[in-house]
Regions:
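Helix-loop boundary and gating motifs at the non-cytosolic
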Residues: 1-56, 61, 210-251, 322
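A membrane-interface helix-boundary motif in multi-pass transporters
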Residues: 155-175, 358-378
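C-terminal ends and interior cores of transmembrane alpha-helices
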Residues: 76-94, 283-298
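Hydrophobic core of transmembrane alpha-helices in multi-pass small-molecule transporters
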Residues: 81, 96-114, 300-317
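Juxtamembrane intracellular "pre-TM" segments in multi-pass secondary transporters
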Residues: 1-4, 189-217
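Helix-to-loop junctions at the C-terminal end of transmembrane segments
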Residues: 56-70, 157-158, 261-274, 360
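Intracellular juxtamembrane helix-capping segments at the cytosolic ends
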Residues: 111-126, 316-330
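Cytoplasmic membrane-interface "Motif A"-like loop-to-helix N-cap segments
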Residues: 65-80, 137, 162-164, 271-283, ...
């Protein structure tokens, strides 16, 4: 019976979708870019693409029709647009990285409104008193599946000559993404409450002073994260000495731990509220770069320990950020609130990525990655302490 059938389908849909999302925006596409000869600045731009795409989230307010139908169509087209990235390695050397960035960017730009549409749809499917537990479990499970995918993808990439292994994994990812769209079509969509016009919905959200303050912290947080974020995997590979298989194993450790921590944070959110989870998880995420910077080829255990810290932080943080936004939003203007949330996230991440490229170009530290990661640590800590006042 509904909505239980659709909630179960959503988990299976997410299992397939996360393979595409992880491989097309994370470890595998970063390794592919390195194999194609990407510079630190190109890596920073690649890391910025998901946040750049968020700038198009306001389009969700102007799209007319069923949230389900729109999400299905946009996801299908976005998956198909990513296909040319796998062929970039066959182009002349000077065109490989630009082609990768172009089609990866177009794919993410096209999918940008889906976040608002899907979250609004799911908010109607999942009762408010269940959101912490449901999304805590779903996100932890998808984290495990995604990182098992990273492990298998890394093994393929290590065993085939570069960049052939990366190309094979990305093609499989597109296939999984297309299958997820089929499952998305099978889920039911509750009737949507009448929404105010787009400008009015945005105006209602913007005039909410408490919410505006929250958006400022979301902006600052993702900016702080992305100052060092694009360089974590390159740091693991080039400074920590990890192979792509070992990077995949790192993510498996993190995701496996997340299966324990995610439900724990979900229960805490349902009991104490999402703001309590926000501060605790943000503090862990803020201090985590200390472990990265302590690791090296000769002394790798802090890098492996950071997998546990990563799970402890992000198994609760991402969900708490989105659910805190939903908690602010009145149902009739929910999409306006969500659009501003995704915009704050995207603008913060984009600014952080731009700062990352500039910081890496200064040439400070033993590698181009040390200074941006250290700077990210300081900025994260400053924002995390401000989250305590929410």
């Amino acid at each position: 019976m509904e909505p239980e059938r659709s909630l179960k389908l959503s988990i299976w849909e997410g299992v397939l979708a996360i393979l595409f999302l992880n491989w097309s925006t994370g470890v595998i596409v970063t390794g592919y870019a390195l194999a194609l000869g990407a510079s630190p600045q190109a890596l920073a731009l690649l890391g910025a693409l998901p946040f750049l795409a968020q700038l198009l989230t306001p389009l969700a307010l102007f799209l007319r029709g069923s949230r389900k139908a729109l999400a299905v169509r946009l996801n299908f087209l976005a998956r198909m647009l990513f296909l040319p990235t796998a062929l970039a390695a066959f182009l002349p050397e000077g065109l490989r990285v630009p082609t990768l960035l172009l089609f990866a960017g177009l794919s993410q730009l096209l999918a940008a409104p889906v976040g608002v549409l899907w979250l609004s749809w799911m908010a109607d499917l999942v009762a408010e008193e269940r959101r912490g537990r449901y999304f805590g479990f779903r996100n932890a499970l998808l984290g495990l599946v995604g990182t098992l995918g990273n492990l298998m993808g890394g093994m393929v990439a290590d065993r085939l000559p570069p960049p052939l292994g990366y190309q094979a994994v990305l093609l499989v990812g597109v296939g999984a993404g297309l299958l997820s769209v089929l499952l998305l079509r099978l889920q039911s969509e509750p009737s949507e409450s009448p929404s105010p016009p787009a400008r009015r919905a945005l105006g209602i959200a913007w005039q909410d002073l408490a919410y505006r303050g929250y958006l400022g912290l979301v902006f600052l947080w993702y900016g702080a994260v992305m100052v060092g974020g694009p360089y974590v995997i390159p740091y693991f590979v080039q400074v920590g000495g990890l192979s792509m298989t070992e990077v995949g194993l790192w993510t498996v450790i993190s995701a496996s731990s997340g299966l324990l921590f995610g439900p724990m944070w979900g229960r805490m959110a349902d009991r104490e509220g999402h703001k309590a989870v926000l501060f605790r998880t943000a503090m862990v995420a803020a201090l985590m770069p200390l472990l990265w910077l302590s690791g090296s080829r000769a002394f790798p255990w802090p890098v492996w320990l950071s997998a546990i810290a990563d799970a402890l932080a992000w198994s609760g943080l991402g969900t708490a950020l989105a659910n805190a936004a939903l908690a602010h939003a009145p149902k009739e203007a929910r999409n306006g609130y969500l659009v501003l949330f995704w915009l704050a996230l995207g603008l913060g991440g984009l600014l952080g990525s731009l700062l990352a490229g500039s910081a890496a170009s200064l040439g400070l530290g033993p590698s181009p990655y040390h200074f941006p990661i250290l700077l990210s640590l300081g900025l994260r800590l400053g924002v995390a302490l401000r989250l305590r006042r929410l």
